[in-house]
Amino acid sequence: MTGTSLLTNSWPLLRWFVSSATLTVPQAAGPVAFSFIALSLTGSTSGGAAMILAMTLAQIAGAVPLARLGRNLPAATMLRLLISFRAMALASITVCAAYGASFEWLVLFAAAAGLVNGAAYGFLRTLLNHFVLASRLPRALGIASTLNEVTFVLAPVAASGLATVSPLLALLAMTTLGALPAIVVPWTAAVARVEGLPTLHGKLLSPEVLLWFACAAASGATVASIEIGAVALALNFGYEPALAITFTVPLCLASVAGGIWISVRNRMASRTAVVVQLAAMALGSALAAVNHSMVMTVVGTVLIGVVLAPLGTYFSLALDTLAPPERRPELFALLRTSQAGGVVFASALLTFVSLSSALVWVTALMTAVTLAVALAPTRLNFQNRA
């Protein structure tokens, strides 16, 4: 691809980045926005947690069927349809809240909104292959990961600020921003198909694919255990709940730094590097589980955060080589679903067992997948792409 064509492709790629950054606004702002709505309607924030749970479970249920449903449509078209459906579901939540409808309707529409999240990510990630050379995918994914972390930092803050004015205003803003991918995502017809990605044919859910799904689930559970358990961690060390940011902010900043590092390096990691990164995440989780001191726990969260983007980038690149082009939306949807499954696992642990026990279980899971990758056959070690 010539320099001229790269320049031509920069505008569609920029639109893809905007779509990627705004795709997750409902997931990022939802916990805060839904909690404020639940508080205003029921007098308790627990309804907000029910809405998020419904959204997450629906995402897991809908990922594969919706990805398969859109297999014969252009990825951009299917993405627009999915995001439009989600926008209507979120708008329905706003209308129901405005008119004081039964709270069960809000939970139902939250599930409808979440139904498309996994598949939408699958189609959006597939589109990236149309706008970027294979050799530049690590950089593009690193940038996307960095923008995603920025979204998860800023969206809850914005939702909280708007909700203090009006919970409905927070919902309206979340719905509007979450609908942007349907407007700005570029059409695949606008850019020539990017070649250069090797593809391995065979079963879609091969042992290699399942291994990376397990790693994604474990990393999702590890991050969620810190984010969801942040308030409990602060209380555990005798601090006010507001100091939960002592754990979440370093986690997010370290993740942003990891995304920037991947963007600058622009290379697919070796399997040895991936094992080291997985081990670092397991060590970070172990430091938090030890419950020795706040400093040690913060160091653990930084270790988790700094390898989050490199690992996510590697999982995505590895799966690129393991599926036929027409099955990539399905595979990427399953990748996002695996991460969501990890979040559900961590949430369940924190609900039914103590914080320390939950962190021990998550550490054990992270250690198990680290050993699995370290001992896996060498065919899982894909060649670096410069």
Residue ranges and their predicted role:
Residues 59-76, 163, 257-271, 354:
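Helix-to-loop junctions at the C-terminal end of transmembrane segments
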Residues 2-60, 203-249:
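Helix-loop boundary and gating motifs at the non-cytosolic
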Residues 109-150:
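Cytoplasmic helix-loop-helix junction between adjacent transmembrane helices
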Residues 272-313:
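C-terminal transmembrane helical hairpin of 12-TM major facilitator-type secondary transporters
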Residues 84-100, 280-292:
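C-terminal ends and interior cores of transmembrane alpha-helices
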Residues 98, 154-172, 345-361:
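Transmembrane alpha-helix termini and helix-breaking/packing motifs in multi-pass membrane transporters
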Residues 34, 118-132, 230, 310-323:
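Intracellular juxtamembrane helix-capping segments at the cytosolic ends
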Residues 326-356:
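A late C-terminal transmembrane helix in Major Facilitator Superfamily
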